[in-house]
Amino acid sequence: MKDSVIRKLEGLLERNEEVLALLSDASIIADQERFRALSKEYSQLEDVVRTFKSYQQAEEDFESAKEMMEEDDPELKEMAQEEYKATKEAIATLEAELQILLLPKDPNDDNNCFIEIRAGAGGDEAAIFAGDLFRMYSRYAESKRWQIEVMNTNEGEHGGFKEVIAKISGEGVYGKLKFESGGHRVQRVPETESQGRVHTSACTVIVLPEVPEAEAIEINKADLKVDTFRASGAGGQHVNKTDSAIRITHIPTGIVVECQDQRSQHKNRAQAMSVLAARIQAVEDEKRRSAEESTRRNLVSSGDRSERIRTYNYPQGRVSEHRINLTLYRLNEFMEGDIDCVVEPLIQENQADMLAALGEA
């Protein structure tokens, strides 16, 4: 490993010890904001520090094995050769892990996220597929013990959704789901199709990180147009009696957010503002990314929401992830929320892209 990388890792090791000492300081414990910030930093350093310590130990074992190989005792020499081979492999594995751990972190990866699913081409079948995708992500969230909260729905006439927006809360949510943004295409025979012909429909998925209140960009109230209207859909006697639904338009960007799933206008407004903040932040982030990465290839996280990223072929039981040329014949399990078989390779591909970019720098 390069000396510059070793020096960086040694610096992180020192910082980890400093943070650990600070966390036991009474004045820090009394300052909850500082204590939380340091606790978060300690948590972020934990993996790289543990891996670097394992690397240091493997290096020591490797040097010891080399010395033992000079011994005259044949049995001892054979043991040393085995140890030499094992530690050499361990060092290579740990070096690769450390390279990944040292990659720049997306500050949003640990955030909660909003997921927006919209039916595209395909009419009723697209809306039904949007419902299937929402169920898939809901099942995935359940498997991770994340919380999912529906923010707004616009139901299809024959089932599913023309649009559904939900908030998913939990550990590392955005980091796992951010590569789901893009065009999702389905090929299957609709239930209403009497000739048995395969139809193609599409949905767009957008995943946005929730912006923590402390980091939220300031939205000028004068830039907002707020409309109230009566909620539609299920809800018993309450429906259509009060203007509880909210529509907020951000005039400078033209972004419009609606929320009507809560009975309280106050709650709908709060939810709409949190979605609006996430969308405005996403626009700002996209501008910055475009400027920074105009000359850099970034296959997975290009963020082009119109780009077709995945095809779900029901007759063949196939899922094809086009960005990494991955095809799997396990559609049923996938639609039941078992999507890590695609989520993890996408994360790994992004890491490989980042490593390649660092190598070119």
UniProtKB/Swiss-Prot annotation:
Compartments it resides in: Cytoplasm
Disordered, as annotated region: 285-305
InterPro entries named among the record's database cross-references: PCRF (IPR005139), Pep_chain_release_fac_I (IPR000352), Pep_chain_release_fac_I_sf (IPR045853), Prokaryotic/Mito_RF (IPR050057), RF-1 (IPR004373)
Positions where N5-methylglutamine occurs in the chain: Q237
This protein's GO CC annotations: cytoplasm
PTM info: Methylated by PrmC. Methylation increases the termination efficiency of RF1.
Residue ranges with Basic and acidic residues bias: 285-296
SMART domains, per database record: PCRF (SM00937)
Pfam families: PCRF (PF03462), RF-1 (PF00472)
GO molecular function, a single term: translation release factor activity, codon specific
Sorted UniProt keywords: Cytoplasm, Methylation, Protein biosynthesis
Function: Peptide chain release factor 1 directs the termination of translation in response to the peptide chain termination codons UAG and UAA.
Family indicated by similarity: Belongs to the prokaryotic/mitochondrial release factor family.
UniProt protein name: Peptide chain release factor 1
